Amino acid sequence: VPESAEGVFPFKYDESTIGLLHVEDGMITKSQFVYGDYAEIEDHNRRLKDDPMIGAIGELGFGTQVLPFSGRDIQDEKILGTIHVATGRDDHLGGKITPELFKEHKNASHDDVLYAPHKTPEIRLQQARMIRGGQTEILIEHYKPAKYMVDLLEAELAVEV
């Protein structure tokens, strides 16, 4: 569960529409049209303005398991080299984004977005970075774990004898 987030990341709305989501203080503030159906971008921006909590970054996850792709996002988000971002509720993960914070109850959802070569081939993930303790760490490069992530995984898998 992220404490905050800043930056811009691409978002695939459907098979033909891509936008750039702008994030400030852990909230998506707007979507910027890249290509496709401009009406989808406008609709998303209207919904963000009407109920800003739908743009709350509720989860940022990195796959850590060596598994084949299944075609099911809930399983594929766990595959090494993938990234998933979720907006909305995170209380089921121990976070503080609860249904009461949303303007309308119907908006109080948790929506995962998976980034993986087979799922989002038009989005080239150059790097995913994390700032921790004042240090910027590269976690993933081109859908492959970077040294920092590999070191974390190796430490987690180390077996004492």
Show the residue positions of the predicted features:
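Metal/cofactor-centered catalytic core regions of large enzymes
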Residues: 1-161
